Amino acid sequence: VGKEVEVDAICDGTDVFVPGIMELVERTGVHSGDSISVYPPFSISDKVKGIILHYTRKLGLAIGIVGLYNIQFIVDKNDCVYIIEVNPRSSRTVPFLSKATGYSLADIATEVILGKTLKEQGIFSIYPEEKKRNYVKVPVFSFSKIRGIDSYLSPEMKSTGEAIGYDDKLNRALYKALQASGLKLQNYGTVFVTVCDKDKEEALPLIRRFYNLGFNIEATSGTAAFLKANGIRTRKLK
């Protein structure tokens, strides 16, 4: 368990360019295409960023990649960085990162493949200064249109599209992205909750936030008893 982080990079055989590091919101184990991605990363340290850049450069040169590649990492609670996978190809996050950073990664990578180095294209730093604005990519799902699909997120990708939001504030960027994805975000109503025993304590702060915002809480018997014991008025569903 940890934070999942993703990079798209370009290697010309001598130098490496990483236009941005993306932090994923969902837990590890959810397919990266079904996870919310945020650039610039919002909770990893400069030390971890340095390790990620070091690994990205070392892997690109060792494998002998010329062009685009994608690496997914896990960062644990002790800031140890682990590699999930390396993909020697373009990825679905290239358009998002191109829009967020202003670098046309497809154009740069094409020039590299044709023999023009990164330095010849005016790129001298492995990692440019991060943008001040927040960019968020959210998945778009079609569960209401495609029958028989389990909506539980897993390593199997289930999203059918993507949407982007950006703003100076991260929470507003996320709100815009969710709106763009077609979600109707309510500021009132009822939240149904059912949580297994091992996750109840972890889920409590989130449920309490909904409760404090004025949402009605409904839950299955075990979850309802737990919430009532923690001061959250809950309607038990039978």
Each language-model region and where it sits:
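Glycine-rich phosphate/ribose-binding loops and adjacent secondary-structure elements
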Residues: A203, A224, L237
